[in-house]
């Protein structure tokens, strides 16, 4: 029986939860250890986590859960077209440039060369971004298209999988497919199935005997959340907090006088992560040269 087309499965105008997954070509461990050479490619799982964080800041799509394994990837995603409706044209344009900056960067490089040749002023170079955004905002047909894309799970998967494939091929100095297909997906119809899917995704490393317990899974959303809570408890209460029971730790987090400090810590962690990702951004974008609309 043929799979249901994505055009039927995904309703861009309606919020929904979807389980999306993809495998490396021939199910090879391209994000794990090469058993022939002994070389580890586990750092590519960090690429996936970092890229997801970057894309989540642009798309109107919630990354509810994810798991990066040696040879495949699981995501639990929720599209939010209702959020896109609240954004004005400038925010839509800014978000799209964040996701696909290559065309703007190309214009900026052209203007920089013209500036070096003395053909234009420094002011003209500084205005390139603003003019580029205004051109996008003045094209209402383009804006309608971009609004659809910003809550389109297919576009998030495209920009995720293409990015990882390009980086991996460049690292291996090869060409060709990295993923066996675009991706596969199932719609989650109720809360019970959403919870079951979340458990399935986060317990993948335990089931595969890569980890003994969920908190040891460094490339799952649950593992990252637990590590964040652990770091927060250490920051606020000190090392003794880690020797208490789970109930005691929950009570610590719930203490009214601690919430503000905990929130400040989490905000600082998010800012540090964003600075780290933005620090990588120029080199990564130059390498990948993603084209909007391709």
Model feature map: region roles:
Residues 1-294:
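Short catalytic/metal-binding and nucleic-acid-binding patches
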């Amino acid at each position: 029986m043929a799979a249901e087309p994505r055009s039927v499965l995904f309703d861009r105008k309606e919020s929904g939860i979807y389980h999306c997954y993809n495998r490396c070509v021939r199910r090879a461990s391209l994000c794990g250890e090469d058993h022939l050479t002994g070389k580890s490619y586990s750092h590519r799982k960090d690429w996936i986590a970092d890229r997801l964080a970057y894309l989540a800041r642009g798309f109107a799509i919630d990354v509810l859960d994810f798991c990066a394994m040696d040879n495949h990837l699981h995501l639990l995603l929720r599209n939010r077209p209702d959020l896109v409706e609240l954004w004005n044209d400038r925010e839509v344009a800014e978000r799209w440039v964040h996701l696909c900056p290559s065309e703007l960067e190309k214009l900026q490089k052209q203007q920089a060369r013209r500036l070096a040749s003395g053909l234009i002023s420094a002011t003209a170079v500084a205005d390139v971004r603003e003019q580029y955004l205004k051109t996008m905002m003045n094209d209402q047909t383009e804006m309608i298209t971009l609004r659809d894309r910003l809550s389109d799970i297919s576009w998030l998967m495209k920009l995720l999988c293409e990015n990882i494939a390009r980086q991996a091929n460049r690292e291996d100095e090869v060409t060709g497919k990295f993923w066996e297909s675009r991706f596969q997906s199932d719609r989650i119809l109720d809360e019970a199935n959403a919870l079951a899917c979340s458990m399935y995704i986060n317990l993948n490393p335990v089931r595969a005997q890569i980890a003994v317990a969920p908190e040891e899974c460094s490339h799952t959303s649950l593992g990252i959340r637990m590590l964040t809570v652990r770091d927060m408890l250490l920051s606020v209460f000190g090392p003794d907090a880690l020797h208490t029971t789970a109930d005691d730790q929950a009570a610590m987090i719930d203490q009214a006088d601690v919430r503000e400090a905990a929130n400040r810590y989490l905000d600082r962690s998010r800012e540090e992560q964003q600075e780290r990702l933005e620090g990588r951004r120029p080199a990564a974008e130059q390498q990948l040269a993603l084209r909007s609309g391709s």
